[in-house]
UniProtKB/Swiss-Prot annotation:
Residues 232-248, 320-330 have a biased composition (Basic residues). Its main location: nucleus. The gene is CCDC86. GO terms for cellular component: nucleolus. Residues 31-44, 199-211, 267-289, 297-311 have a biased composition (Basic and acidic residues). Residues 49-58 have a biased composition (Low complexity). This is Coiled-coil domain-containing protein 86. It comes from the Eukaryota. The keyword Nucleus applies. The lineage of its organism: Eukaryota, Metazoa, Chordata, Craniata, Vertebrata. The modification Phosphothreonine is found at T60. It comes from Bos taurus (Bovine). Keywords: Chromosome, Citrullination, Coiled coil, Nucleus, Phosphoprotein. The keyword Coiled coil applies.
Length: 354
């Protein structure tokens, strides 16, 4: 690293220019600052892209109306802004001048904007900056206008994260200066999506109109393509809706649906056999019922006969006993034909019932 002595020795031959021609001084200052930043780009870590925003220029420029203090005062309010915003604030103020670098190069002039692009008040304060040039060459201080001019031009130099200027053609100033999220250009950019969204909103409306216009001829085409239905056939293709208005039984007389004579005779025979079998079952049931009835009557008759054979009878020949008999005894007396019994039995023993 160079010492301030060698740097001052190297710059002894330079003479401050007259206030009438301040553009050469500004060019030399910007060239020095640019070549100072080039050898240190590889050594320093990259800072976030929002640190070197153009919004910092009005704060550090000597002609800025936003700063109440003068540029040469070095107020403590302005130093924290320089330390936090610009990458040069972290460097030693004694390292502002490069070592063994030419004072001007074509690449540096391509990257430098014209003096007309600066603020209008910056040209008024150039005379003061030129008057203090010898002091800044000997011993630069962080509060002097030389240091402020370097920091102001440092905002125009390429960012440490960007490539160093080379033989390629230079990019526009807007691309070289990094943008910060709070910069006025970034504030104007969010308004672009709504502007881009407005055509998007208007886009579907013509499509709908085109679709509606396309649907109109499309709706006419099917009407024209409908085939003509031949006379005698229904529109829906249902055969039972014929123009002749015949009955369904007459329309469905197909050959597969007709039954043969043998099939008809067979079905008739089956029906007859079923009826005969049902009649036979009824007759069998009636026969069983009659047989049961006869058995019951025979059983009754046989029981009565057995009772008569087993009873003891007494024939009452004296009618006076009947008169003297009580009602209970008269209930048990019956009149019977005893002729058969008398014939079977001997006459000395007549049949009587007690």
């Amino acid at each position: 690293m160079d010492t301030p002595l060698r740097r001052s020795r190297r710059l002894e031959g330079l003479k401050p220019e007259s206030p009438e021609n301040p553009t050469s001084v500004l060019r030399v200052r910007r060239v020095l600052v640019e070549f100072e930043s080039n050898p240190k780009e590889t050594g320093e870590p990259r800072s976030p892209p929002g640190l070197g925003s153009p919004s910092r220029q009005p704060e550090t420029s000597p002609g800025s109306p936003s700063l109440p203090n003068g540029p040469a005062l070095g107020s403590p309010r302005k130093q924290p802004e320089l330390d936090s915003g610009s990458p040069e604030g972290h460097r030693d103020p004694g390292l502002n001048f490069p070592q063994n670098q030419p004072e001007s190069s074509p690449e540096s002039h391509l990257l430098q904007p014209k003096p007309s692009e600066e603020s209008p008040k910056f040209s008024q304060n150039q005379g003061e900056a030129d008057s203090e040039l010898p002091k800044s060459k000997e011993e630069p201080t962080p509060g002097c206008p030389r240091h402020q001019l370097q920091q102001d031009s440092g905002s125009l130099e390429p960012f440490p994260g960007q490539k160093a200027p080379g033989p390629e053609p230079s990019k526009p100033l807007q691309e070289l200066t990094p943008r910060s999220p709070g910069s006025p250009r970034d504030q104007h950019e969010p308004s672009k999506p709504p502007a881009a969204g407005e055509p998007a909103r208007e886009g579907p409306a013509p499509k709908k109109r085109e679709g509606s216009s396309a649907q109109a001829p499309a709706s006419k085409k099917p009407k024209e393509e409908i085939p003509v239905i031949p006379k005698g056939k229904p529109k829906s293709g249902r055969v039972w809706k014929d123009r002749s208005k015949k009955r369904f039984s007459q329309m469905v007389q197909d050959k597969p649906l007709r039954t043969s004579w043998q099939r008809k005779m067979k079905d008739r025979q089956e029906r007859k056999l079923a009826k005969d079998f049902a009649r036979h079952l009824e007759e069998e049931k009636e026969r069983r019922r009659q047989e049961k009835k006869k058995r019951r009557a025979e059983n009754l008759r046989r029981r009565l006969e057995n009772e008569r054979k087993a009873e003891i009878v007494q024939v009452i020949r004296n009618p006076a006993k009947l008169k003297r008999a009580k009602k209970k005894q008269l209930r048990s007396i019956e009149k019977r034909d005893t002729l058969a019994q008398l014939q079977k039995q001997p006459p000395q023993r007549p049949a009587t019932k007690v």
